[in-house]
Amino acid sequence: MIAIIDYGMGNIRSVEQALKYIGAEYIVTSNKKEILRSDGVILPGVGAFPKAMDVLEERDLVCVLKEVCDIGKPLLGICLGMQLLFERSEELKDCSGLGLLPGEIRKLKVSYKIPHMGWNELRKEREFPLWNGLVDGSFVYYVHSYYADCPDEIVCGVSDYGMQVPGFVAKGNVFGAQFHPEKSGEIGMQILKNFQGVVEAWKSSQLSI
């Protein structure tokens, strides 16, 4: 069972429909017990970083997400949800994030139109489970104005938009997609299937303990 975190700032319906399409079991929730009972977690997000962190704090979800990370449960952040995984952001004001990944969220400084919106090529930087079954250079759908300034060793895929934009990031059981898998057609469905596979593997490992 995958828990989609509902905190009022995500593409909940799009993610829900995508998981339904691939046949994944899921629940939309902000309940701590339900999140911790799940086998994997998706943190979606659309909007401003400071507001999102305020809402997560108000709903006591910051501690829950850190606990999810600590116990090794697979966690996938999408778009703003990915950005929230990092240590801090400069969006609107200096603001602390969840601190589950090293790095900071910064404004795109490019001559191109901002936000970076539309399809872009995703190039492989290193292997990790969410790449399974994907062709290097597949096109995915972006909508964002900020990017993750983070260590190279956690960047698994990049896109070019006047600069290299980390599209895929990962460290241990924590995964992030700056783009929207749920809006990226069959490529996105494969990515979500891959995450489902990671979740099932983690569930099996817990049953064998």
Swiss-Prot record:
Subcellular localization, as worded in the UniProt entry = Cytoplasm
> Which catalysed reactions does the entry list for this protein?
5-[(5-phospho-1-deoxy-D-ribulos-1-ylimino)methylamino]-1-(5-phospho-beta-D-ribosyl)imidazole-4-carboxamide + L-glutamine = D-erythro-1-(imidazol-4-yl)glycerol 3-phosphate + 5-amino-1-(5-phospho-beta-D-ribosyl)imidazole-4-carboxamide + L-glutamate + H(+); L-glutamine + H2O = L-glutamate + NH4(+)
**Does Phosphoprotein count among this protein's keywords?**
no
Domain Glutamine amidotransferase type-1, residue spans: 1-205
CDD domains with a match to the protein in the record: GATase1_IGP_Synthase (cd01748)
Q: Name one GO molecular function term.
A: imidazoleglycerol-phosphate synthase activity
One GO BP annotation of this record: L-histidine biosynthetic process
Pathway(s) of this molecule: Amino-acid biosynthesis; L-histidine biosynthesis; L-histidine from 5-phospho-alpha-D-ribose 1-diphosphate: step 5/9
**What domain of life does the UniProt record list for this protein's source?**
Bacteria
Query: What InterPro entries does the annotation carry?
Result: Class_I_gatase-like (IPR029062), GATASE (IPR017926), Imidazole-glycPsynth_HisH (IPR010139)
User: Which keywords fit this entry according to its UniProt record?
Assistant: Amino-acid biosynthesis, Cytoplasm, Glutamine amidotransferase, Histidine biosynthesis, Hydrolase, Lyase
Please state the span of the N-terminal signal peptide per the UniProt entry: none
Recorded GO cellular component terms are: cytoplasm
- List, from the UniProt record, the residues annotated as the active site of this protein: 79, 180, 182
- Give the EC number(s) listed in the UniProt record: 4.3.2.10, 3.5.1.2
How the protein assembles, per its UniProt entry?
A: Heterodimer of HisH and HisF.
Q: What does this protein do?
A: IGPS catalyzes the conversion of PRFAR and glutamine to IGP, AICAR and glutamate. The HisH subunit catalyzes the hydrolysis of glutamine to glutamate and ammonia as part of the synthesis of IGP and AICAR. The resulting ammonia molecule is channeled to the active site of HisF.
Q: What is this protein called?
A: Imidazole glycerol phosphate synthase subunit HisH
Task: Report the source organism.
Answer: Bacillus cereus (strain B4264)
